[in-house]
Design a protein with these regions (language model features):
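Cytoplasmic membrane-interface "Motif A"-like loop-to-helix N-cap segments
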Residues: 81-92, 297-311
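Conserved MFS/SLC helix-loop-helix module at the cytosolic interface between two early adjacent transmembrane helices
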Residues: 70-109
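Helix-breaking motifs and short loop linkers at transmembrane-helix boundaries and internal kinks
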Residues: 51, 83, 104-110, 121, ...
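A late C-terminal transmembrane helix in Major Facilitator Superfamily
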Residues: 353-391
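Extracytoplasmic gate region of multi-pass secondary transporters
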Residues: 39-40, 235-290, 345, 349, ...
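Cytoplasmic helix-loop-helix junction between adjacent transmembrane helices
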Residues: 114-154
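Helix-loop-helix hairpin linking two adjacent transmembrane segments in secondary transporters
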Residues: 149-200
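C-terminal transmembrane helical hairpin of 12-TM major facilitator-type secondary transporters
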Residues: 302-348
Length: 428
């Protein structure tokens, strides 16, 4: 049946079912960043409590990323096979349990194990969430939808430094993790109760919503796929995007993970001041993400050019951050760098959402995000080693982040952007 011609259209609803789905996904993403990024503020105190040097502290970050990266592709495969709803709900509940367990750890080996399993739970989630966004949103809205979802990349770290600094100051670092494990159980229940893998099965979906999806969804929003994994791997753009995301995320995770420590140890900010100053750049980043998402939908042909341009500008302001003598000006330059860096990030995901068919989005985005999380595995210990080998100076760490961001722009120049059909046909 052709939905576009066979279904009578009623008056469009102001609040659509896909907005509820996006809200739940946004809350889950916010919690995922909050749960992982409080470690950035807690790390100096964990290091002091457990007698760890900066290299060992970097290993704690890497333990999470190893588990997180390891389950990017399996998480996408599971989402394509069993549907996003089940994988998201299980993943959120899993990582929430291990968030609370982090607060009970008293030794480095056990900390590494707990953070690894925490990473596994979070690793199942991204691909499933992107698959659901691509299933529920027509192509004309995906840039803005992913930009809204991506605001957590900035709001999460910003909120994390405020929450962590407040709780650590009052109760110590253990309590931060114990408390933050609780909300995820409620969000997991919300995902299970108020989302469906196939939009047609959602109780709040309207005929108008289905018509909008039918206009560019050849499978009508099918939530599952039996496309062979080897066929997914044959897409050249997939590997180019994974490479770009790997290079970008080395800078992103270095910026996000080490910023609080940099302000405390180099700029000599107090814990309270760090809680405020470390949050401000991420608020600018949220603005950059939303602006980038809007421009991504409005300026599709210029996406590649805009990614390259804003990445180069962000790299320039990163250089000014560590080279300026004024601590307050360093924060200003961090804010400008974050604005352009996250604008570029929105461009990246707009390109991916529009070039990858929705019925293989789970596996495809898992492959791309695997590249990004391998960057997280590498970024934290390498930056920790650079700091330690430079007698506490962060200059070489900043140069490393600048170089990888510029390399991501260079690789982007090689990408041939093309708009694919929204789905690949399932095998009989």
């Amino acid at each position: 049946m052709n939905l576009q011609t066979s279904l009578p259209l009623g008056k469009p609803k102001l609040w659509k079912a896909r907005y509820t789905v996006l809200t739940l996904i946004w809350l889950a993403w916010l919690l995922s960043f909050l749960d992982r990024m409080v470690m950035s503020v807690s790390l100096p105190y964990i290091g002091k409590d457990l007698n760890l040097d900066t290299t060992q502290q970097g290993l704690i970050i890497s333990a999470f990323f190893i588990g997180y990266a390891a389950f990017q592709i399996p998480g996408g495969m599971l989402a394509d096979k069993f549907g996003s709803r089940k994988i998201m709900a299980i993943g959120i509940a899993w990582w929430s349990i291990f968030t609370s367990l982090t607060g009970a750890v008293l030794a480095l080996p056990l900390m590494l194990i707990v953070r690894f399993f925490f990473g596994i739970g979070e690793g199942c989630f991204p691909s499933a969430s992107w698959k659901m966004i691509s299933t529920y949103f027509p192509s004309k809205e995906r840039g803005r939808a992913t930009a809204i979802q991506s605001t957590v990349n900035t709001l999460g770290p910003a909120l994390a430094v405020v929450v962590a600094a407040s709780i650590i100051g009052a109760f110590g670092w253990h309590m931060v993790f114990i408390v933050l494990g609780i909300p995820g159980l409620f969000i997991a229940a919300g995902i299970w109760l108020f989302t469906r893998d196939n939009p047609k099965d959602h109780p709040a979906i309207t005929q108008q919503d289905l018509v909008e999806l039918a206009s560019d969804n050849q499978d009508g929003g099918q939530g599952k796929s039996n496309i062979a994994f080897k066929d997914v791997l044959k897409m050249p753009v997939l590997w180019q995007m994974a490479c770009i995301w790997f290079l970008f995320d080395i800078t992103f995770w270095g910026f996000s993970t080490w910023l609080p420590s940099y302000l405390i140890t180099v700029r000599e900010f107090s814990l309270a001041k760090t809680g405020v100053m470390a949050a401000i750049p991420f608020l600018f980043g949220a603005g950059g993400t939303l602006l980038g998402g809007y421009c991504s939908d409005k300026l599709k042909p210029q996406r590649k050019t805009l990614y390259v341009l804003t990445s180069v500008i962000a790299a320039g302001f990163l250089y000014l951050t560590f080279s300026v003598s004024s601590a307050d000006m360093a924060v200003v330059y961090q804010c400008v760098s974050a604005l352009f860096m996250f604008f570029a990030m929105a461009m990246f995901w707009g390109i991916l959402m529009d070039t990858i068919p929705s019925n293989i989005m789970g596996r495809a985005s898992g492959i791309v995000n695997f590249g990004g999380q391998m960057a997280g595995v590498i970024s934290a210990p390498v930056i920790g080693w650079l700091i330690q080998s430079s007698d506490g100076s962060y200059n070489s760490a900043f140069i490393f982040m600048i170089a990888t961001l510029l390399c991501s722009a260079v690789v982007t120049l090689t990408v041939k952007i093309s708009h694919s059909v929204n789905t690949l046909p399932n095998k009989a």
